[in-house]
């Protein structure tokens, strides 16, 4: 288990961070990320799995899993909800007998959890999210991945209405997604495929160091017991209960295309994405669908996410945005060509790209964004 309590106390005294990760290592030869997710889903409906593979099908160094979040942040049409799960402690018998007025929480017994909810109306959820991120900001630790806990979830396409309110975007259709759903995971299970280790990670909060360190050590032991002896959930496969149909019929969609072409001709826009979601009633779980994706379409960004009311599974080749060491990067595929095998082929691909109006429009759109 590392770092030591003395090292954590030293880092806490510096005052740079309010949360410091602590880690316990296990050998990974008895586990797989898929098997681990079966255990975590049995313990909590709120969980995730993040994995990565490059184009040559070489798997990334880490697979990340999390469960049982301490907070969930959701927002729909400006109504922001923050649900917190706080741990409960009880005085030990000796403290009661001596008549102490206050409980020393470092010596208190952990007896359970309680939930609370805060609801507010906001013009932009980003302000509340930034405050929470700042409260739980953690240092990068030796022998740990850069992600050691934090927010995991999704922002829907409708989230744009908070950044561009003047567009007055309204949706007549009832959407399946909230504007955002983010969960705060203090515990992380990371598979280090390079070192063949499973890293169990939780956080020590510096505002009550003794109590928090003791509880973190207990939590790591609870995680160890869970993954070694926990029950596994059987995920029922997806079974369609109705035909898959587009949200817009062909005639309506063609009408939308013609209207978009008119706006482009008038100069109001130069590109538009006209989505047409496919819908069907189904039973079962998306987790087996995720397993098929990771086997048939290994990608740099593969994800499975589950909450009380939704499951999401996907595999994406693109880096939308990446923040590392204070540097923000984006690597979209639109408006690009693959590299050639020779300098001559590179030149030919470059010339073809520069003459492709569609690719140029996509490139300009991304630069504009």
Task: Give the positions of each predicted feature.
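Extended alpha-helical targeting/anchoring segments
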Residues: 1-100, 104-106, 111-369
């Amino acid at each position: 288990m590392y770092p030591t309590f003395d090292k954590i106390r030293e880092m806490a005294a510096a005052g740079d961070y309010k949360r410091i990760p602590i880690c316990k290592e296990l050998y990974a030869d008895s586990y797989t990320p898929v098997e681990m997710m079966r255990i975590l889903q049995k313990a909590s409906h709120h969980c995730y799995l993040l994995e990565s593979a490059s184009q040559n099908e070489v798997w990334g160094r880490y697979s990340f899993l999390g469960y049982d979040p301490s907070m969930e942040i959701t927002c729909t049409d400006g109504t922001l909800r923050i649900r917190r799960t706080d741990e409960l402690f009880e005085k030990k018998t000796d403290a009661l007998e001596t008549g102490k007025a206050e409980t020393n929480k470092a010596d208190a017994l952990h007896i359970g959890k309680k939930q609370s909810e805060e609801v507010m109306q906001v013009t932009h959820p980003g302000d509340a999210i930034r405050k929470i991120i700042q409260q739980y900001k953690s240092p990068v630790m030796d022998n740990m991945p850069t992600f050691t806990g934090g927010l995991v979830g999704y922002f829907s396409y409708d989230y744009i209405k908070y950044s561009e309110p003047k567009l007055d975007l309204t949706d007549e259709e009832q959407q399946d997604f909230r504007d955002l759903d983010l969960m705060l995971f203090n515990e992380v299970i990371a598979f280090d495929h390079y070192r063949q280790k499973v890293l169990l990670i939780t956080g020590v909060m510096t505002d009550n160091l003794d109590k928090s360190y003791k509880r973190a050590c207990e939590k790591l032991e609870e995680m160890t017991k869970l993954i070694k002896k926990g029950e596994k959930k059987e995920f029922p496969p997806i079974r369609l209960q109705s035909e898959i149909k587009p949200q817009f019929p062909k005639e309506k969609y063609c009408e939308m295309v013609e209207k978009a072409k008119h706006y482009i001709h008038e100069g109001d826009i130069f590109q538009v994405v006209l989505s047409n979601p496919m819908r069907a009633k189904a039973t079962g779980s998306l987790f087996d669908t995720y397993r098929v994706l990771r086997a048939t379409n290994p990608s740099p960004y593969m994800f499975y996410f589950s909450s009380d009311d939704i499951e999401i599974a996907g595999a994406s080749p693109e880096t939308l945005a990446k923040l590392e060491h204070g540097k923000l990067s984006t690597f979209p595929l639109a408006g690009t060509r693959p590299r050639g095998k020779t300098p001559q082929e590179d030149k030919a691909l470059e010339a073809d790209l520069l003459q492709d109006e569609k690719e140029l429009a996509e490139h300009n759109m991304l630069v504009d964004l």
